[in-house]
Amino acid sequence: MRFLARLMAVVSFGFIAASAMASPTEPVEGAEYHRLQNAQPTDTGKKVEVLEFFWYNCPHCFAFEPSLTEWIKKRGDSIVFRRVPVGFRESFVPQQKLYYTLEAMNRMDIHKQVFDAIHVSRQKLDKEEAILDFIEKHGVDRKKFLDIYNSFGVQSKVGRVRQLQETYRIDGVPTVVIDGQYITSPSIVGSTMRGASEQAMNAATLQVMDALVAKKK
């Protein structure tokens, strides 16, 4: 029993020490980010790939979106940013297809409005018919949208997401992957910030992302 108690004390001390040394501007592996054992190749050349795994219905993704959008603008041409709509269950597929259809139609101006409709106006956009009604109200041709929504290209991208989720072991959102190797999120960063507000955790996450991008440049 004494040995077990000592072991637990050592483990606890190690965790506390790592948390104490961690900071958003100088993040510590295992505290504010995780490293994927097998780094994945990227096709972004000298630029750093940044993936954000998200779900439209997720309130934390909605809260993260404004500051993330500003961060993307600030980083400019130093990164290639890609959003990845997760598909943890079959019921997620309509919103995955919604995102990729908007992307294919070059109508990403509606992306924020989808978040607002769900989290501000309390609209349910998890079924095809509701999605079609929504995009039509925003000036998108219903038939053209539906053709792309059901296209092989969109279906292929949805299938690719399942592979990415498994590769990066995504089990929650929002989660960010830097250059196929470093994984962080407001949840991971927040584990070192007891009692911090969601806004503070989001801000700290962006600082961690800055540091990880700099590490890869």
Regions found by a protein language model. Name each.
Residues 2-93, 205-217:
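Extracytoplasmic thiol/disulfide redox context detector
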Residues 4-5, 138-217:
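C-terminal cap of thioredoxin/glutaredoxin-like
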Residues 46-48, 77-80, 105-111, 141-142, ...:
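Loop/turn elements at helix/coil->beta-strand transitions in domains of secreted/extracellular proteins
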Residues 56-60, 87-91, 117-121, 153-154, ...:
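Solvent-exposed loop/turn segments at secondary-structure junctions
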Residues 63, 69, 73-77, 103-107, ...:
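Sec-exported extracytoplasmic/periplasmic mature domains
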Residues 65-72, 95-99, 111, 128, ...:
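Extracytoplasmic/secreted envelope proteins and their assembly/folding machinery
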Residues 74-104, 111-136:
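Structural microenvironment flanking redox-active thiols in thiol-disulfide oxidoreductases
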